[in-house]
Amino acid sequence: MNQSLLSQFGTSEERVKRAIEAFKRGNGVLVLDDEDRENEGDLIFPAETITVEQMAKLIRYGSGIVCLCITDELCQQLDLSPMVQNNTSINQTAFTVSIEAAQGVSTGVSAQDRVTTIQAAIADNAKPQDLSRPGHVFPLRAKKGGVLARRGHTEAAVDLASWAGHKPAGVICEITNDDGSMARTPEIVEFGKKFNYPVVTIEDLVRYASNK
């Protein structure tokens, strides 16, 4: 990871603390994973507080695949089965079946509809019948143990939400460049400065979690 670029966002510990503070306020955070993994940056918001405006930003600047990162317990509560029985994904990304709110949405694609779906999924007494399948929100099952168990954006989202005092759920989307290519560290740093988002790495989060 290009530490010289990241140093403008503080030390590793400072970057994590700023990310947690942003989450506490319901703001977004940019999370970079390892260069030898996906080498991508995701914009992540706490699911509990995500707004239509924030969702619109994810859709506009991201890949369009908006994912809801949740715990295994919530997946079981909602009866969300894996998207496939045999996961051959290189990074073992744990997609479940996609979802839509059973009520209060039209086509399910708009920013408002996706926020409605997320709110339905993470509601305190959410039930399987509160969701239709398939839909336009893609749940991801976080590994128990968070980033210490798997160095993924999924686990980063759930950990950040928990550390900030929110429900353990986050909304993520990979940031793309204007030409459709994936944004790497230099572009993510510029994006963070432009929109005033903290930038943190998975390695930062692992270090922080190890010392908790």
From Swiss-Prot:
Residues noted as binding D-ribulose 5-phosphate in the record, renumbered to the chain: R37, E38, D42, R150, R151, G152, H153, T154, E174
Chain positions of site Essential for catalytic activity: H136, E174
Residue positions binding Mg(2+) 1: E38
Listed transmembrane segments: none
Catalytic activity reported: D-ribulose 5-phosphate = (2S)-2-hydroxy-3-oxobutyl phosphate + formate + H(+)
Cofactor: binding details: Binds 2 divalent metal cations per subunit. Magnesium or manganese.
Listed GO MF terms: 3,4-dihydroxy-2-butanone-4-phosphate synthase activity; magnesium ion binding; manganese ion binding
Cofactor list: Mg(2+); Mn(2+)
Residues reported to bind Mg(2+) 2: E38, H153
Signal peptide region: none
Record pathway: Cofactor biosynthesis; riboflavin biosynthesis; 2-hydroxy-3-oxobutyl phosphate from D-ribulose 5-phosphate: step 1/1
Domain of life: Bacteria
UniProt entry keywords in alphabetical sequence: Lyase, Magnesium, Manganese, Metal-binding, Riboflavin biosynthesis
Gene Ontology, cellular component aspect: cytosol
EC number: 4.1.99.12
Top EC category: lyase
Pfam family, one: DHBP_synthase
Biological process, per Gene Ontology: riboflavin biosynthetic process
Job of this protein: Catalyzes the conversion of D-ribulose 5-phosphate to formate and 3,4-dihydroxy-2-butanone 4-phosphate.
Similarity field: Belongs to the DHBP synthase family.
Subunit field text: Homodimer.
Protein name: 3,4-dihydroxy-2-butanone 4-phosphate synthase
Annotated source species: Histophilus somni (strain 129Pt) (Haemophilus somnus)
Gene behind the chain: ribB
